Amino acid sequence: AYRKVHHPPIAEMKDFGIFLAGELERFIDETHLDRSRMLGVGIALPAVIAPDNSRITLAPTLHLRDITLQFLAKEIPYPTYIENDATSGGYAEWFLYWHRDMAYLLLETGVGGAVLVGDGQYHGVNRRSGEFGHMCVEPGGLPCKCGKRGCLEAYCSAWRISDDLGIPLSEFFAGVERHVPEYETMWHDLLRHLAIGVNNIRMVLD
């Protein structure tokens, strides 16, 4: 079952947690899921999460920094685990392909990733491994929401298209198919930097 809802701005984590718990219960009721069979709830966020799972260290696309997570799952009456969105997507692919070692690259509003080897994710010292979106693919290049310049995310994310052109993705790709010069130029620039990023990942991980 699947449901998409619009959420209020994440200004207060406590209020957002109450909203999230309410939407979850509504979803369970509408889809007639058996609560007694629920193993738990997963919350995926486009954010760097502290090693102890206590706070968001940085979430550029959400405009959040150093925000506590203690209230996010407080109203949810099921075991709840909070994880980075790209890591969650990486695990889904990892299970699908029978636990093969892999690097997962996610292109959405931002750019993320995960490295999964052996029995699970390689976290790194600060639980930041797989942040492929913030590897440099153009020294001194476009500014990124993380504060650096030349990041893969600055070139290959949906927000670049929406910020630079002021249009949604659907309109952008329709324009590429119609050979609109401005859109084609950005598309080829995006592909060039994506190729650099993918090649970097390949060379590092073999």
Q: Which residues fall in each region the model found?
A:
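Adenine-nucleotide phosphate-binding core of ATP-dependent small-molecule kinases
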Residues: A11-D34, L152-Y155, R160-D206
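Short beta-strand-to-turn element immediately C-terminal to the catalytic PLP-Schiff-base lysine
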Residues: E93, A114-G118, Y122-G124, V137-E138
